[in-house]
Amino acid sequence: MNTFLIDYQRIQTPKKGFSRLFCDYTSDTEARAKLVSNCFHLDYRKDADYYRHLGLLASRDFKRNALVELLLKQNSRFGGSERQRQEIEKLRSSRCMAIVTGQQTGLFTGPMYTIYKALSAVVIARKQKELFPEYDFVPVFWIESEDHDFDEASATALFAGAGLETIQAEGGHRQQDQMAGPTPLGSGITETVREFLDLLPDSDFKPEIAELLHSAYTPESTFEIAFATTMNRLFSNHPLILLSTQDAEFKRLAAPMLCKEIESAPASSYDVVAQSSTLESMGYPAQTKPRAVNLFYLNQLGQRLKIEQPSPENFMILPDRQRYTRHQLLEFCQDHPERFSPNVILRPIVQDAVLPTFAYIGGPGEVSYLSQFRKVYERFGLVMPFVIPRGSFTLVEPKITRTMDKVLKVTGKPSFSRRQVYEALFGNLQELRKSMVSGAENQNLDALFEQVESEVTRSLSTLEPALVKMDPTLQQALAGSSGQIAKIIGNIREKTYRAGRRKHDELLQQLDKAELNLFPEGVPQERLINIFYYLNKYGPSLIDDLERVLQGYSTESHLIVEL
């Protein structure tokens, strides 16, 4: 696999690139140093921070045995392997730390970055073990199943034919604002799986994929269980641990943080506002806006309802307008923590209170919003873990690689490399198109044909005096021959131009196909396309291949991998 690294700063996809904050965070600039010192607690580039955080986590009192029992039960439910069970058991020791990542449940695992997050956690856990052999590091995947964005959780996309197809699952009976994870798949899921499989071309690997999806996505299952079962099958040979936050046992572990949010509301929101002000003074926009209470209330139907704070000591649950005093709501949370769900601001706080989180592996958006939460961590008496960018890939199929070779020939200078073609493609696609048009038309041809015509005319003119001297009638024959030669050259010129235009059109069509493959709907491939499109063509070993690529490279650059 040929692999090329591109700095995030160079990437500008048709719809949008990466935020300036994320580009600075992955750069080697003064801006990064300022960002880290003002918005994060730890810098993953500083060795001293590693030793400091290891000592801190080893000394903290986590409910490790309760956590292990919960994870064992969950992973058994999700079809976890013996290797995963062994990884869970390691968490009983105070010298075991978690490398955490996570994502919302997605149909058939959703966009490819879900897989890349899991792989990144596995690889970074292994690298930390190599650096600190006296400690254990286990990769934990937090399943965000309490999110109520059902449209996102129930859809996925893949390439089909000459375009893009989106598959949407209807799900069983569902209320508005109901959590996506526990939603039943319903009777329509069998047809959804069939539609998805029909879009995959026949291959040696398709029967195995069909068996996996049909067994995981059954009418009586839920979006969360199907997602977790599929992830466990894909990572059965890897030490990945899945964590669901829906279980009442987990909420009991999280109860101190949930209750503290109610007890101190709206203090954490003020913390976010203050940290956001620091960000904005550095020129970065705030990504997340806090609420007075950064919790949702879960009713009996599984709906996530907002909690408002109309006055300092009074709370209201919307839209039902149930009213509680602070004391009443706090007592309710202490007795029934399973009825509360953290929002995007409190979620990482709960995560790092329950888990011995050494590092969080996040995407560009997560790095941005975590930069707003430093003061919230401090309020809850926590140190923010290392925030490490996840692995980011673009997979380039052989047909697209061949197009890149043609682009290289048309636009290339003697020293132009394939990597520079990718940089041009990811950096300024329109400029690359102009280069291709210019290269295909070959503006030097006009001058070359004019030079040939001039030389032929001059050569024939040189013959004329000698021919006339020999026989005056030859002058007419010479003139006729000159006209014929000019006509022949003109015909060759026209055929050359037609070939150039045809080549130009073919190249642009091929570039359009490459653009669809690399930037479907104008966004990076990893944010939209489902991994099974590639597993069907290249086999389940593709996940192992990408793991090896990640093992050899930093996640601070985007990785272009030619398959």
Curated annotation (Swiss-Prot):
Disulfide bonds: none annotated. NCBIfam families: thiol_BshC (TIGR03998). Residues 494-518 form a coiled coil. Its EC number is 6.-.-.-. The lineage of its organism: Bacteria, Pseudomonadati, Chlorobiota, Chlorobiia, Chlorobiales. The gene is bshC. GO terms for molecular function: ligase activity. This is Putative cysteine ligase BshC. HAMAP family: BshC. It is an enzyme of class 6 (ligase).
